[in-house]
């Protein structure tokens, strides 16, 4: 690995292209890619001057010339391909959501434990520059204890494009709830520094007519005592100013508005003026996917532990299942996280 860790990309669509560009920026050597669609496989291979391109993911993950693979696949393929890659001695980065079920996520975690290889989930929002700045401010105690948060990711018309698997829950794990909601909830658990213990949620599908939810609103409670609201949509008839992404943190001594045109802003001084004074926060230079891949490389090198590793993926899928149980039953669901990889369910 002295000349750079050798990486293969499984899935040559837009996400695979983003992974390839970020991995190259992070210092990986891009060796090969796999995809069943010849045109996009050829385009990715040509753009990044890959030595090999194959149609079969299994062939790629068993290539002895690779140290790691990045999986940019339909969600139902994450588990079988990740397990094959781990057994073949590869470290694995997997796009979100982790799997279609917590059982599948546990299977990945068990295999990672047995093989001693790294699994990292692409919770890329944790690595954004604004999010990193907010996390640093929170960890340094500038805001005090967090008691509430609000997060939204609202698209007016933004149903994922593809071959239709996004709208088949057996293939995707769900609709907007897992596609947009899970990354936002993961970000909140990261910022608050606490696991979700209870979830209550509702969903709607009034615009697209899809068989999965296009809108989800949830209320979360955390071990720390904090609460949070999360709203996400693929397609929503809304006032233009509502569209986009927001994340606002309310704490004992300050409030944080993470997504503003000026970048993340912390409001302090409420006790003196009754209205907080905004102060823009400094942001790191490297963010998003490049920061994610640098973290992946450091995990492989043994310099740090995965920020969202195999066990975290199990927790995320348990949370997703609780979200859907609440939607189906109309009840608040308690989450008792069980990540014991020795058990199959």
Where on the chain are the PLM-derived regions?
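Beta-loop-alpha module in the N-terminal Rossmann-like domain of NAD(P)-dependent dehydrogenases
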Residues: 19, 48-111
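Contiguous beta-strand/loop segments that form the cofactor/metal-binding neighborhood of enzyme cores
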Residues: 186-263, 290-303, 336, 340-345
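C-terminal helix-rich "cap/oligomerization" subdomain common to oxidoreductases
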Residues: 1-4, 68-71, 117, 223, ...
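Hydrophobic residues in well-ordered beta-strands that form the structural core
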Residues: 94, 119-121, 150, 230, ...
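N-terminal Rossmann-like dinucleotide-binding module
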Residues: 1-48
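Predominantly a Rossmann-like dinucleotide-binding segment in NAD(P)-dependent oxidoreductases
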Residues: 125-210, 330
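Rossmann-fold dehydrogenase core element
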Residues: 106-125, 145-149
């Amino acid at each position: 690995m002295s000349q750079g860790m050798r990486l293969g990309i499984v899935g040559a669509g837009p996400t695979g292209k983003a992974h390839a560009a970020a991995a190259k920026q992070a210092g990986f050597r891009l060796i090969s890619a796999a995809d069943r669609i010849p045109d996009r496989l050829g385009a990715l291979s040509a753009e990044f001057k890959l030595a090999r391109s194959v149609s079969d993911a299994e062939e790629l993950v068993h290539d002895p010339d690779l140290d790691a693979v990045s999986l940019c696949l339909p969600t139902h393929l994450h588990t079988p391909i990740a397990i094959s890659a781990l057994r073949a001695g590869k470290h694995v980065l997997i796009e979100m959501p982790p799997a279609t079920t917590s059982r599948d996520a546990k299977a990945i975690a068990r295999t990672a434990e047995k093989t001693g290889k790294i699994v990292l989930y692409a919770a890329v929002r944790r690595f954004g520059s604004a999010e990193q700045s907010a996390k640093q401010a929170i960890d340094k105690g500038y805001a005090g204890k967090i008691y509430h948060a609000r997060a939204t990711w609202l698209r007016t018309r933004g149903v994922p494009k593809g071959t239709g698997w996004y709208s088949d829950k057996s293939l995707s794990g769900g609709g907007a709830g897992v596609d947009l909601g899970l990354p936002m909830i993961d970000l909140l658990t990261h910022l608050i520094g606490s696991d979700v213990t209870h979830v209550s949620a509702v969903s709607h599908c009034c615009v697209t007519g899809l068989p999965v939810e296009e809108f989800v609103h949830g209320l979360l409670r955390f071990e720390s005592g904090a609460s949070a609201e999360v709203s996400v949509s693929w397609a929503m008839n809304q006032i233009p100013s509502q569209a986009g992404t927001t994340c606002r943190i309310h704490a004992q001594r300050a409030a944080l508005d993470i997504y503003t045109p000026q970048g993340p802003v912390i409001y302090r001084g409420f006790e003196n003026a009754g209205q907080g004074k905004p102060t823009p926060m400094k942001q790191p230079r490297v963010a998003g996917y490049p920061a994610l891949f640098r973290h992946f490389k450091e995990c492989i090198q043994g310099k740090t532990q995965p920020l969202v590793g195999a066990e975290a993926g199990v927790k995320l899928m348990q949370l997703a299942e609780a979200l859907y149980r609440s939607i189906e039953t109309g009840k608040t669901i308690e989450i008792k996280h069980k990540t014991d990889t020795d058990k199959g369910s």
